[in-house]
Amino acid sequence: MYKSQQRNCQPEWMDDPDTDTVTLQHAVDDITKINRLLGGFKFTLQAIKKLIKNNAGKPVTIVDAGCGDGAMLRYLDQHIQGDHVQFIGIDLSARSVKCAREKSEGLSRVRFRESDILNIDTSIFSCDILTSTLTMHHFKDEQIVTFLRKFKEMASMAIVINDLHRSRLAYGFFKYFSPIFIRHEISRHDGLISIAAAFKKADFKRYSLAIGVNNDLVIWKWSFRYIWIIPTHER
């Protein structure tokens, strides 16, 4: 399954539309747990805070593409203060958006939209920062380039991608230790596929060339994560 020199994009169980709601929620809950334990949320927060630190209270809209149950936006809402910052989660899955709305009830700055992001009219809907966490590895290279081009159209300030590092060491760690801290079979199964479908730094550079970007920044994090920051204001 794991191939060092190329991504192995096998379907994950959680991508199957026939996966029952309870099983899917188990997978989402495990992803949220891993993000909290291994700093996934914090890495995105740090990147966004750096991007907006000189914004001087100007309105900022942050979009989370492939938001799932909205856990990332709830985390950002908790740690980024000010009514001038608004959060919008976009997901193609109706049940994910329904779950996100239920879990985010009472958060006035957070809202969600069920939509295919590729079909959004950017003349009437845009944002300042677009972020996406553990979503990109679900797609093949040509699909990723298509998404990134759309993201560039939407985001006036920057794109922040948070995703996995394709590493034999990470694959081995997860294979042997995930039964200890992950209860659900779907998460153990999909976790290995996710690592095999993840990225090396050279992959991001190929995508950058494909979308005409040369000022991006790729940051490696200790938990086998990459934060990929793509400024979009210098076009």
Placement of each model-derived feature along the sequence:
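Class I SAM-dependent methyltransferase "Motif I" SAM/SAH-binding loop
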Residues: G66-G70
